[in-house]
């Protein structure tokens, strides 16, 4: 469960950091949004290094599914737009793949 929690921390940090840039450039918010945004992106990068994986590529691949799930939760809770059935189906497929990568047996590795 610690792995999933770390992936969720990374996802929230990345989405929050990227949203700060979105707010500045697309929603006409103050450039001061970039200060917490950059700190959040640094937290995201740090969190991914805490994943229990010997290979960065595998950690990033598994993260992708968790990122998609978290992005759609963000869209719903922060932006007020509920995911549709295609968002949900795509998320189920991606998270299923991420879970296979995270929990799949690694013979000899």
From Swiss-Prot:
User: What does UniProt give as GO cellular component?
Assistant: plasma membrane
Kindly list the residue ranges recorded as spanning the membrane: 4-24, 31-51, 59-79, 88-108
Superkingdom in the source lineage = Bacteria
The annotated topology with respect to the bilayer is: Multi-pass membrane protein
Alphabetized InterPro entries for the sequence: UPF0060
Q: Which Pfam families match?
A: UPF0060
**Per UniProt, which keywords does this protein have?**
Cell inner membrane, Cell membrane, Membrane, Transmembrane, Transmembrane helix
The record's subcellular location field reads: Cell inner membrane
Query: Is Endoplasmic reticulum a UniProt keyword of this protein?
Result: no
Which HAMAP family does the record associate with it? UPF0060 (MF_00010)
The Swiss-Prot or TrEMBL record describes its family as follows: Belongs to the UPF0060 family.
The protein depicted here goes by the name UPF0060 membrane protein RC1_3291
Q: Which organism is it from?
A: Rhodospirillum centenum (strain ATCC 51521 / SW)
């Amino acid at each position: 469960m610690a792995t999933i929690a770390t992936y969720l921390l990374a996802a929230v940090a990345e989405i929050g950091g990227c949203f700060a840039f979105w707010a500045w450039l697309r929603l006409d918010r103050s450039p001061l949004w970039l200060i917490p945004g950059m700190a959040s992106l640094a937290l995201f990068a740090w969190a991914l290094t805490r994943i229990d994986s010997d290979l960065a590529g595998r950690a990033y691949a598994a993260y992708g599914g968790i990122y998609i799930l978290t992005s759609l939760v963000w869209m719903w809770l922060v932006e007020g737009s509920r995911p549709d059935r295609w968002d949900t189906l795509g998320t189920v497929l991606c998270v299923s793949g991420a879970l296979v990568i995270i929990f799949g047996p690694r013979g000899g590795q």
